[in-house]
From Swiss-Prot:
Transmembrane segments: none
Pfam families reported for this sequence: NmrA
Protein name in the entry: NmrA-like family domain-containing oxidoreductase malD
Entry's Gene Ontology molecular function annotations: oxidoreductase activity
Gene name of this polypeptide: malD
Biotech use: Malbrancheamides have the ability to inhibit calmodulin, calmodulin-dependent phosphodiesterase (PDE1), and induce both endothelium-independent and endothelium-dependent relaxant effects, suggesting their potential as vasorelaxant agents.
Length: 336
């Protein structure tokens, strides 16, 4: 395996996924990776946080191909993630997330990047026979298919599981009953979901704690993961078990209620509720397969995490269980 210094350029490095990748690569004990972050605003607080960790900042707009080619020049590898929720994509007839993703991959290829890890999404429409559609998920899926045909030395799509960090957003919590931060009038926390499907265990990932390490593991041996879809998961866990773990670590009362169907998630005019309905509709239709057509597994992520932590000089390379994640978040919220 090549032992020279490797420049990895991160597109989307100021976001949750990208910043996790930046932190992990820069923590390599032998400083194997030099990290460059492409950003539209190098003066932003998030960009400066990357710089303080030791990342190089380069200004470029992903829609500007020539700028982006220059930003990727000299890179051995690239991690690419785009934000499918940008307001610009809501303009009828305007640019799309597919336009951005495909342009960025064109730029990486033109710049001579050998190894690309791309944060992909789910094709809900395809695997529900057209019953469910999500522009955000599907645009990433189609960019992935485009990337597979670009002829990179290695191209590895990683599909993130549902983010544990979603529980830090009030809109997400309230769409499922308020758990784990908003008590009911009864004095307990309520988690209410439709059936998920399969064995009811849903894949979740701690983006902060695990996602970057999983990507780090890929970059340690990219040839072994060429064209293999990586499941970016920390744990497979049922909602009922989440409530049990929450009560165990917090000592608070909580209850799980299973709704009859995805249509029982109440709408409130926000895209969050619509997306939740789409996800539960799709997952139940697919027998609980988040990574359809594949069954969910964490063996690959477990291996990649361990390899990354060893490269950082850390012997405990365990993935983050929801129980540990919620305990950490609960401790952060307690008054000093």
């Amino acid at each position: 395996m090549d032992t020279g210094k490797r420049l990895v350029t991160v597109f989307g490095g100021t976001g949750n996924q990208g910043s996790s990748v930046v932190r992990s690569l820069l923590a390599h004990k032998d400083k194997l990776f030099h990290v460059r972050v492409i950003t539209r605003d190098p003066t932003s607080e998030k960009a400066q946080a990357c710089a303080k960790l030791g990342a190089e900042l380069v200004k470029a707009d992903g829609f500007n191909k020539s700028e982006t080619v220059s930003a990727f020049m000299g890179s051995w590898g690239a991690f690419v993630n785009t934000n499918s929720d940008e307001e610009i994509y809501k303009i009828p007839g305007g640019r799309s997330d597919y336009d951005l993703g495909s342009t960025v991959l064109d730029a990486t290829k033109e710049a001579g990047v050998k190894h690309v890890v791309y944060s992909s999404g789910l094709n809900l429409c395809k695997y529900t026979n057209g019953r469910v559609h999500s522009e955000g998920f599907e645009s990433k899926y189609y960019v992935e298919q485009y990337g597979r045909r670009k002829g990179f030395q290695t191209f590895t799509p990683i599909v993130p599981a549902s983010f544990m960090e979603a529980f830090l957003a009030e809109s997400f919590c309230q769409s499922l009953g308020g758990f784990p931060w908003f008590k009911r009038d009864t004095g307990e926390y309520l988690l209410a979901t439709p059936p998920y499907g399969g064995d009811e265990r849903m894949p979740w990932v701690s983006v902060e704690d695990d996602f970057g390490d999983i990507v780090h593991g890929i970059f340690l041996d990219p040839d072994s993961y060429h064209l293999k879809t990586i499941q970016g998961s920390s744990e497979l866990i049922s909602f009922e078990k989440m409530v049990e773990d929450f009560m165990e670590v917090t000592g608070e009362k909580a209850r799980y209620v299973r709704l009859k169907s995805w249509v029982d998630i109440p709408l409130d005019g926000t895209s969050c509720r619509e997306e939740m309905r789409a996800i539960f509709h799709s997952m139940y239709s697919n027998g609980g397969k988040w990574f359809v057509p594949d069954e969910s597994e964490i063996d690959t992520a477990t291996t990649l995490k361990k390899e990354a932590k060893l490269a950082q000089g850390v012997t405990d390379g365990s993935l983050t269980a929801f129980k540990d994640w919620i305990h950490k978040q609960w401790e952060r919220r307690l008054p000093n």
